[in-house]
Structure formats: structure tokens, C-alpha cells
Amino acid sequence: MIREAKQEELQEVLNLYLYLHEENVPEQSEHLSVIWSQIIADKNHHLIVNIVDGKIVSSCVCVIIPNLTRNIRPYAFVENVVTHADYRGHGYATECLNYAKTIAVNNNCYKMMLLTGSKEQKTLEFYKNAG
């Protein structure tokens, strides 16, 4: 099941990010709580999760950026694409990206950009195949 993350899923999202590039989960703090609440409340910030057997196994972030050009049409950035190592190769991240594309289309975005800092060939091939 694909949907946007809920307020109570912060810890599960942070644990998933250990499979992205994080070395540890941030300590609970006021700053962390404020940032998480901002993300959840922001209508242009979409933290997409893919749930399998009640567990968040894949995720990505899609942010809609208001814009004054292109006939005042926004654009979308996609970042932080990650899948739990035990669930890779089953299309879960692709499903998250497709959900992000639907959000971008529904918001009349004129383009959608996938951002990555990865140099790994397997990751780059995945993004290339995702379009």
C-alpha cells in the first residue's frame, strides 16, 4: 500500500533511512519534532511510503515548488529514494516514484526532477529505468 507518511511513523521512516546513507538515527529532540511536524503539515512536501505486511519498506520524498515561469506552473523535486535491503528488487521504490509522478501531475507540474548524489551504477541504472 502506498500513501503519505503519518505523524506517528517518524521512527519507522528514520529507521528506513539507515538504508539510504545515514549511519545512525537522530536522537529524539525538539528540533527533530519541529522538523517532522513541518514536513507532515506542508501541503507541498510529500513523504511517500510503501507498506508491505504492515512495515514501511520503501519511501521517497516529492516536493512541489511554486514557480512564476512556465505559465505559473510548479515543478517537482524527488529525493531520498530508499528501499529496505531485504525488500529490494520487487518494484517497491518504482511504485513510490509512480506515486510521486501522480502527485506532480495532479499539481500541474511542468517537470519532475529526481535528485541523487549516488555514484553507484546499480542506483543510476534504476533511476534511468524509472524515467
How would you describe each model-predicted region?
Residues Y127:
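Conserved active-site tyrosine of GNAT-family acetyltransferases
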Residues P66-V78, R88:
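A conserved beta-turn-beta hairpin within the catalytic core of GNAT-like acetyltransferases
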Residues S37-V49, F77:
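A short helix-loop-beta-strand connector motif used in the catalytic cores of GNAT acetyltransferases and
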Residues Y87, G91-Y99:
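Conserved acetyl-CoA pyrophosphate-binding loop and the N-cap/start of the following alpha-helix
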Residues L14-W36:
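Conserved GNAT-fold acetyl-CoA-binding loop/helix
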Residues V49, K55-I64, V82:
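Conserved beta-strand in the GNAT
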Residues L97, A104-T116:
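Conserved GNAT acetyl-CoA-binding A-motif
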Residues M1-V13, P26:
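A short beta-loop-alpha structural element at the N-terminal edge
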